[in-house]
Curated annotation (Swiss-Prot):
Gene: rplJ
HAMAP family: Ribosomal_uL10
Entry protein name: Large ribosomal subunit protein uL10
Lineage: Bacteria, Pseudomonadati, Dictyoglomota, Dictyoglomia, Dictyoglomales
Gene Ontology biological process terms in this record: translation
PANTHER family noted in UniProt: 39S RIBOSOMAL PROTEIN L10, MITOCHONDRIAL
Assembly information from the UniProt record: Part of the ribosomal stalk of the 50S ribosomal subunit. The N-terminus interacts with L11 and the large rRNA to form the base of the stalk. The C-terminus forms an elongated spine to which L12 dimers bind in a sequential fashion forming a multimeric L10(L12)X complex.
Gene Ontology cellular-component terms listed: cytosolic large ribosomal subunit
Length: 178
């Protein structure tokens, strides 16, 4: 029979996981408390938190969310979870940049919007621009042809108006001179 404290801890982890739109799993073996504090300070402004977890409890919590996914591989050895509550790509970029300077921080993998990613895929995803940039690029690529179409449709009408205006001014000059 599980202890009430463990049941409560699993429930707390489960609630954190439910509220996050991405979970990044890392190994932190060998990093000092000061290093972890520095890492937490880098990702806190990005609306993310970095927490060391007990593997058995975290695995129970995550299996409630994703019972059909094989996630045991992420919970071998010392494990910390980064909970991303906003755009995960900015947090990924910050984690990868931090790992360049602190080689002891190793990626195990992650879950972003319900999809499981390996450590290598997580590093590749970190190279993507933030969601807002991608969306603005998509909107720009959609609106550019539309603007061009509108201009091309307006051009003959504008040309006709300018021509008629020029003819009217010319006739006005002729009638004044007579």
């Amino acid at each position: 029979m599980p202890k009430p404290e463990k049941i409560q801890k699993v429930e707390e982890l489960y609630q954190k996981m439910l509220n996050a739109n991405a979970l990044i799993f890392t190994e932190f073996k060998g990093l000092s408390v000061a290093d972890l504090t520095q890492l937490r300070g880098k990702i806190r402004p990005l609306n993310a938190e970095y927490r060391v977890v007990k593997n058995t409890l975290a695995l129970r919590a995550i299996q409630r969310m994703y019972p059909d996914k094989d996630l045991e591989k992420f919970f071998v050895g010392p494990t910390a979870i980064t909970y991303c509550y906003d755009d995960p790509f900015g947090v990924l970029k910050a984690l990868v940049d931090y790992a360049k300077d602190h080689e002891l921080l190793k990626f195990k993998g992650g879950i972003i919007d319900g999809e499981v990613y390996s450590a290598d895929e997580i590093r590749e995803l970190a190279k993507l621009p933030p969601k807002e940039v991608i969306l603005s690029q998509v909107v720009g690529s959609i609106s550019a042809p539309l603007s061009s179409l509108v201009w091309n449709l307006k051009w003959p009408v504008n040309k006709l108006v300018w021509t008629l205006d020029a003819i009217a001014k010319e006739k006005e000059k002729i009638s004044i001179n007579q």
